[in-house]
Amino acid sequence: MASYKPVVIPAVPKLGEKITQDTLYWRGYKTPVQIKEFGAINKIDFSPVPPYNYAVTASSRVHIYGRYSQEPIKTFSRFKDAAYCATYRDDGKLLVAGSEEGSIRLFDISGRAPLRQFDGHTKAVHVVGFLSDKYRIFSGGDDYSSSLWDIPSATEIVSYSEHSDYVRCGCASKLNGDVFITGSYDHTVKVFDARTKSSVMTIEHGHPVESVLLFPSGGLLVSAGGRYVKVWDVLKGGQLLVSLKNHHKTVTCLCLNSSGQRLLSGSLDRHVKIYSTTSYKVVHSFNYATSILSLALSPEDETIIVGMTNGVLNVKHRKPEESKEKSQKKRQPAYRTYVKGRNYMPKQEDFFVSKPGRCIMRKYDKLLKSFQSSKALDAVLEPHIRLYTPEVTVAVMQELNRRGTLRSALAGRDEKQISLLLTFVTRRVIEPRFTPVLITVADMITDIYQPVVGQSALVDKQFLRLQEAIGREIDYQEELLEVLGMMDALFATLTEKRATYLEENKSNGLTKTLDQDISI
């Protein structure tokens, strides 16, 4: 008796992933380290100076982590309620943070108690940072105002009340010590100059603005809000250069790499997209477990950190590059390895014993082996098979048809099972690789259950959907045939013109070949 041969699942060729230099570069990070914080992480900021520690703002604390440490090396907890947007100064010596109660606190990295406290906002302060002159602080709060503060005197210099909704993001120019930018939920981005009493530029983003970023050159501004990341030319009065829509949910954070050639964006859709700042196309993407609130890249691009809504801090360090001198060469096999067994001469009385390989059969193969056609069809109609590997379902249907038992496997089913079959056929019949088999299945289902049509509203609805799907496919085929007819006419006309042109050249004694003819 011949052994059972498992059902052959036709393999469909897959397109290989395009490997680029960016792909190789961004894959060069180690397995991430997970650090659990006390709450959602709203801000991550790297110190601009070595050893590049980073500040993490979560819940009512600001933790300072060493670059490779998994435990905080310092904690600032002098907040009555939630803390927001802890940011380093350019020299890495001071840290400023906003709070839910509306006050702003300035900390010395070497101490624990706040050096200064700035009071003036009446509601939560979600954005705070240093101007590039190092002696002033800008802030924005839920009271719709943006303020400028003097560090030595701990007083408010000027306050702007131009936004009509919460101010949730901001940044300062690195070239001009008087310029800072704020973004608000009123869909606008405003550019302020400390020397003026009002904003100098207003940009309409179109969605609540979650993050803004100014290029180091000061000429380009990036805003994120809704599903959009937009790039603006500040030197041309806020002209829109490009609008990127590569996320499926709200974009919450932005970041630039050290060279300014790559822009990173994080979103609630759990993705970090990396764009080229020349073509503004996505060159790589990272996937994470939950929604992303904050994102930071170390000054040397050696560490990428993502903060998520569940309070998890995801830290990826770059793999060290191995020098060619230190890399050990693989040991070459000994000579006896190559000549082993070459001098053996088989004898006539030798017995050759072949060990049969163990074949693990799937559930549907076991049922087919025992000729249980109906149960085999039920096995491949399970959700995890019909939804994710429909080629297995179709292959079993094809095998049942080859055996002549497909009709008996389809017969004798209740309303729910018939509806499931029709749903699968309707969804997959338009795929060319499944069409021949599923047309046969559809014909058999129609023949078997035609007498009961009209007795079940659910089955009737599925039959109508199948009819609509087949009708649409027939219309597509007719349109394609029309296009093929047009193309045949064009090719025929082109062939006639070339033949006429060639005859004219021959009659004139020209020796030009058809490959050198002018394009028609």
Curated annotation (Swiss-Prot):
CDD domains xref list: WD40 (cd00200)
Q: Which Gene Ontology cellular-component terms appear in the entry? A: nucleolus; small-subunit processome
Membrane spanning residue stretches: none
BP-aspect Gene Ontology terms: positive regulation of transcription by RNA polymerase I; ribosomal small subunit biogenesis; rRNA processing
Highest taxon, organism lineage: Eukaryota
- The WD repeat units are at 36-75, 78-117, 120-159, 162-202, 204-242, 246-285, 287-326
Stated role: Ribosome biogenesis factor. Involved in nucleolar processing of pre-18S ribosomal RNA. Required for optimal pre-ribosomal RNA transcription by RNA polymerase I. Part of the small subunit (SSU) processome, first precursor of the small eukaryotic ribosomal subunit. During the assembly of the SSU processome in the nucleolus, many ribosome biogenesis factors, an RNA chaperone and ribosomal proteins associate with the nascent pre-rRNA and work in concert to generate RNA folding, modifications, rearrangements and cleavage as well as targeted degradation of pre-ribosomal RNA by the RNA exosome.
Q: What is the organism field in this record?
A: Gallus gallus (Chicken)
**KW tRNA processing (keyword) present:** no
Full protein name: U3 small nucleolar RNA-associated protein 15 homolog
* Description of how the protein assembles with itself and partners: Part of the small subunit (SSU) processome, composed of more than 70 proteins and the RNA chaperone small nucleolar RNA (snoRNA) U3. May be a component of the proposed t-UTP subcomplex of the ribosomal small subunit (SSU) processome.
Q: Which Pfam families match?
A: UTP15_C (PF09384), WD40 (PF00400)
